[in-house]
Amino acid sequence: MDYLVTIGLEIHAQILTRSKMFCGCSADYAHAPPNTHVCPVCMGLPGALPVPNRRAIELAALTGLALNCRISNENVISRKNYFYADLPSGYQRSQYDDPLCVDGWVEIEGDHGPKRIGLTRVHIEEDTGKLVHTNDGGSLVDFNRAGVPLMEIVSKPDLSSPEEARRYFQKLRQILVWIGVNSGDMESGALRCDANVSVRPVGQQEYGAKVEIKNINSFRFVERALAYEIERQIRALKAGEPIVQSTRGWDETSGTTVAQRTKEFAEDYRYFPEPDIPPLHLTDVWIAERRAELPELPDARRRRFIEEYELTAYDAGVLTDERAVSDFYEQAVAAARIRGVTPKDVANWMTGEFFRLLKETGETLEIAAQRLRPDYIGEVQELLNQGVITRTSAKEAFEASFREGRSPATIVAERGLAVIGAGDALTDLVRQAITGNPKVVEEYRRGKATAIKFLIGQVMKASRGQANPQAVQQALEQELARE
């Protein structure tokens, strides 16, 4: 029997603000000593009154617009009531009936081509504290994270495989980092995911029981956790066992999902409007201002790179994966065009030597760009186009510019990387190659025309790649004909 898989993801993304969602405490908790970024508001002490973070709401709305959502004019902050050690007040300020953003979508590469994944909502809430488990079985609580602004991005059950879920998660991360609302750091918990999955036999109309997998913090784990859970549910159905709606956790060590509790329903949280925060009214003018903040998004820029710069789909995709890379490329293209260098040539340097050096050094583009100016790419290609340097010398000059922050032209002059053309220097190298390889010379004279390629290689090696290959071949042919 075949089975249909239905998946929906809930992405929890911390909003990049300096202060917390409802108080003035610093939201930068990563390296702070435990429980130092706290106050009566985020600790839930009686009488402490919350004040919504304006910038957090603006960035959440910006996210909704980037995800093709409709922004709600009327918003209500609600209390989500439950008890857990990392929730000091006994409730979480969130949204329920009236979320900030509704009815969006994201396009991904599905299993069978482009696929639009619907979004139910994007709502704002506050993060919880962090539990630290000790070796003796105890647990400690750090409340520095409690109250940090958070968005929950809820997809419709439109995903059909673990691979699609991974691609969707990756696309969301790309967009959130691109527009500057989230760091994308999954290791620190700034971006995490809950996955809902159900399985049903082909032909069955109603969905199977939904199982939620909590707190997944990597693309690889999303795919692995869903693959395992789907297989577990299929095995149970084949054995005639019912699937119970429940919450499970992903155990990366064993590669399995582990039962945690029976799945709660919304009624269990007893949502009600937060009495200390009046409804938020967002005007159409305010929403238009947020829309004006929205930059060109990755998909739109990728399409433009293909059309305007005539890049391949692959190159355009690589160069729009990160906004910093994409912006650097555009700056390099603008400078290169003045020199008659094409956008494709710039793309080749970026996706080739530049990315290789970034990987080799472990640097981010932001760090490397403090040395390598965007116009250096066009400069080194111009020297190559003019025949001043060879491809080998161009790579050497580019790497030196990357590491030293000096112009390619300066490096070419200092290192003597200019092409060795016709003249005494080239003649000397050619004669050395002929003298040092008598057997190859003899083969050439007996009619083996390809033997000259070996001699060309010897000259190029001796010149450290600086000799012009065409000039080398011409000089060799002249010398060999003379002897």
Swiss-Prot record:
It catalyses: L-glutamyl-tRNA(Gln) + L-glutamine + ATP + H2O = L-glutaminyl-tRNA(Gln) + L-glutamate + ADP + phosphate + H(+); L-aspartyl-tRNA(Asn) + L-glutamine + ATP + H2O = L-asparaginyl-tRNA(Asn) + L-glutamate + ADP + phosphate + 2 H(+). One of its GO terms (molecular function) is ATP binding. The keyword ATP-binding applies. Coiled coil: none annotated. PROSITE patterns: GATB. GO terms for biological process: glutaminyl-tRNAGln biosynthesis via transamidation; translation. Keywords: ATP-binding, Ligase, Nucleotide-binding, Protein biosynthesis. Its EC number is 6.3.5.-. The keyword Nucleotide-binding applies. Disulfide bonds: none annotated. Belongs to the GatB/GatE family. GatB subfamily. Heterotrimer of A, B and C subunits. Allows the formation of correctly charged Asn-tRNA(Asn) or Gln-tRNA(Gln) through the transamidation of misacylated Asp-tRNA(Asn) or Glu-tRNA(Gln) in organisms which lack either or both of asparaginyl-tRNA or glutaminyl-tRNA synthetases. The reaction takes place in the presence of glutamine and ATP through an activated phospho-Asp-tRNA(Asn) or phospho-Glu-tRNA(Gln). This is Aspartyl/glutamyl-tRNA(Asn/Gln) amidotransferase subunit B.
